[in-house]
């Protein structure tokens, strides 16, 4: 599950810049509203833990789980539209987990990119087959529709552009 870690390959400059910008952001938010500062610090701690785990994880393992990942994303997107979803300013885009608030459409951007990379690469030899085109369009359309129902037009457009780019690169 975890790959052999080599510190010399780690982009330390990038990590330092991210922490520097995050610290500046926390200080600016803290000067405007103290109550938000603790939430931002919690986000920094949780984000750092996630960064460490993800940087040590071999992403090829995720590629073997691409169907469960797709199903999980659909489940989260459906949960947003149920009473578990939290509405803010007329948009129901979040799931309130009490400790943090999760926005599944943001996670969907990354996971759908991984899903379609694996899905399309597995079908390289029949990429121009009409059945492959229809299945790909349906698999894209379901989460896109759910995200559009939240409503989150910018995320829908983003994943549509990524999907169209992937389709173009594969040679449809």
Where are these regions (language model features)?
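N-terminal membrane topogenic signal
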Residues: 1-18
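Hydrophobic alpha-helical transmembrane segments of multi-pass inner membrane proteins, especially
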Residues: 15-172
């Amino acid at each position: 599950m975890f790959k052999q870690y080599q510190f010399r390959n780690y982009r330390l400059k990038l990590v330092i810049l991210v922490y520097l910008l995050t610290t500046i952001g926390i200080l600016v938010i803290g000067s405007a509203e103290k109550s938000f500062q603790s939430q931002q610090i919690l986000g920094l701690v949780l984000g750092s833990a996630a960064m460490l785990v993800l940087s040590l994880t071999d992403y090829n393992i995720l590629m073997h789980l691409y169907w469960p990942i797709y199903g999980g994303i659909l489940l989260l997107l459906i949960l947003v539209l149920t009473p578990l979803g939290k509405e803010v300013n007329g948009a129901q885009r979040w799931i309130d987990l009490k400790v943090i608030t999760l926005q599944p459409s943001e996670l969907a951007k990354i996971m759908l990119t991984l899903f379609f990379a694996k899905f399309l690469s597995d079908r390289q030899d029949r990429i121009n087959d009409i059945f492959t085109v229809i299945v790909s369009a349906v698999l894209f359309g379901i989460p896109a529709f759910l995200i559009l129902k939240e409503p989150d037009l910018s995320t829908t457009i983003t994943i549509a552009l990524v999907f169209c780019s992937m389709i173009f690169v594969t040679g449809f």
